[in-house]
Amino acid sequence: LPVARLIAIALLLAILPARSPAVEINILTGGPTGTYIQIGRDIAKAAEECGLGMTVHESAGSLENFLGVRQRPVTQFGIVQSDVLEYLKTFAANDPEVSRAIFGVRIAFPLYDEEVHLLARKEIGGLADLEGKRVAIGVENSGTFLTASLVLDLAQVSPGERLMITQDESLTALLAGDLDAFFYVAGVPAKLFASEEIDADSFHLVPIGDEVLRQVYKPTEIPAGTYPFQTGPVEAIAVKAVLMTYGYDPRRNAYHRESCKAVSDISHVISSRFQTLQETGHPKWKQVNLTELPAGWDIGECVNVGLAPAYRLPCDPPEAETAATPVDTTSESEANRAYRRQICAVVGC
């Protein structure tokens, strides 16, 4: 279990930095040009308009973000891919290290889908053809690295070489003949694949439709013409970006109490300004479904506090009556049922 072990070992060896004297609000996102950091900046802007300061941090991606929420003080939020959450939850029951690694981490909000791209030489027709080949899987600790590793493991495919390099480096190597294929997880359309250097006679997006993967990932399709070299639709899978938080206990101490309030405040900002985020934020906000919760994970109690009808911030407009649409929540935890009721009351279902 390479990915789960990596997370567990990193947690066990982590050294906690000194805690700040006052609780700040922080979110871990991703690289400087990625979607995660833009989503984080949108949230921070909405928070600022409400008089709340939130610092947006670059990171290596999902793994660092999960570790940060779990282990790093004054780091209340981090964006993590849903397949990593699924993998951890699956193995936590039988692996004490993994169980400790995920303890206390909770969902804040589900976000948007990200498509798994696999660009390869034309003769590679499917995942099985990657056996023994040179395959780039992204920089270590990035979301692409984690997803590519999981996809290859689940499909039981063993490339001859797994290169941990950036997507730009991967494309250069592929075009030069030094690579057979590379993975890239990014929302469609991904700017990288707009390059006119990608010759349709030599390269293509490999369809990913393996049944075992479709049971774990969301089946999707990359429409024809999304990229200059792509003439037809391509079967694909998608992962969901999820905003994660920690299950702070306000009864424990002042730090937990203040951190819980920070989570409640930001949760209130996101839910009450969701329409504005969709209208003025990154285009991916338009694809966010706040009720599409990953299975097996609970909403943080501090999140639900911020979603309660009575929760108010000084920047809130006058209260208005909103009728909630009834939803079937009988199979969920009480925390998730409460979340759905309150989200439906705010944004509708």
Q: What do the predicted segments below correspond to?
A:
Residues R5-I15:
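Bacterial N-terminal signal peptides
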Residues G40, H57-S99, S170-A173, P189-E197:
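Pocket-flanking alpha-helical
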Residues A18-A22:
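Sec/Tat signal peptide C-region and signal peptidase I cleavage site
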Residues S158-A262:
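Pocket-lining segment of extracytoplasmic ligand-binding domains
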Residues E97-L111, Y227-V234:
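A structural signal for short loop-to-beta-strand junctions that line the ligand-binding cleft
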Residues A236-C349:
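Segments of small-molecule ligand-sensing domains
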Residues R70-I79, R134-V135, A176-Y184, A200-D201:
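Alpha-to-beta junction loops
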Residues V23-E48, E114-A176:
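Bilobed "Venus flytrap"/periplasmic-binding protein-like clamshell domains
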